[in-house]
Amino acid sequence: MTSFLRLVLLGFFLIFVFAVFCTPPALAQENPYIVAYDHYLEEPGNLEIEYFSTLGTQRGGNNFHAFWAEFEYGATAWWTTEFYLDGQTTFNDSTVFTGFRWENRVRPLKGEHFINPVFYVEYENKNGADKILKEVEGHDVESDFLVSNAQARKDHIHEIELKLILSSTFKGWNFTENTLAAKNLSNSPWEFGYALGASRPLALKASAKRCTLCPQNFVAGVEMYGGLGDWHSFGLHDTSHYLAPGLAWNLPSGWTLRLSPSFGLNNNSHQFLVRWGISREINGFGSMVSRLLGGRK
């Protein structure tokens, strides 16, 4: 493991300790999606720290464990910005840091509507060994992961990713559709993809008592996501697709746990992925930092 990756992990650990001991619990109801996005943004001034992990099978090669940390901040009521750090371990190969991402989501309309649009812009600086599968785009297929880490790391990727998120909530149900367009800043064509999601709490009525295993603390859902080819060959040919049920457990302490097995839907896909995540929201993080730096409350 490189010294840079050790430093990143140490910083992530220290911030997580801060989240546990220095902040009141957050009561937000998180969805179970790993790939799809709904229209809900981070509350202004709040910071959410998240860790996600993907264990993937690899036919003809070594299985892998990909992981990433997310730092999501509510800049305003209509703008959420997020920073990612990615890495992966390929069994019988090595552990590598694969890059970073800077994501921004903007919600142009106030209030709730039948369809709530969100505009998504992300810059990715990564290498070819990245395996987090945060999205599937273009002609991404399982065989892409057969290259060794040493060889894949030589491929440096600078990419802009755009999404249009259309999300609705009706009688407790959330339905979301994400359309993706990504452009490697080298001489490569635009690539396309999609993600669909539906979710609902197991119970809509909150309990009068604080409890851990109450049905309303669990949100169940399902995602489907995959690639749609590129500018020169748009469509389903030579693309991969996945179906992923998911469950989010929102604890009264403010922690959220997620679990989502993913099943490949064709021969171009990984047969099976297991994803899980843990997150914690720090209320009033922006105000705390402002006070520490001598700013106004």
Where are these regions (language model features)?
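Short helix-onset patch at the extreme N-terminus, typifying the N->h transition
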Residues: 6-8, 34
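Transmembrane beta-barrel domains of Gram-negative outer membranes and organellar outer membranes
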Residues: 28-297
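Bacterial N-terminal signal peptides
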Residues: 8-20
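N-terminal secretory signal peptides that target proteins for export/translocation
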Residues: 1-5
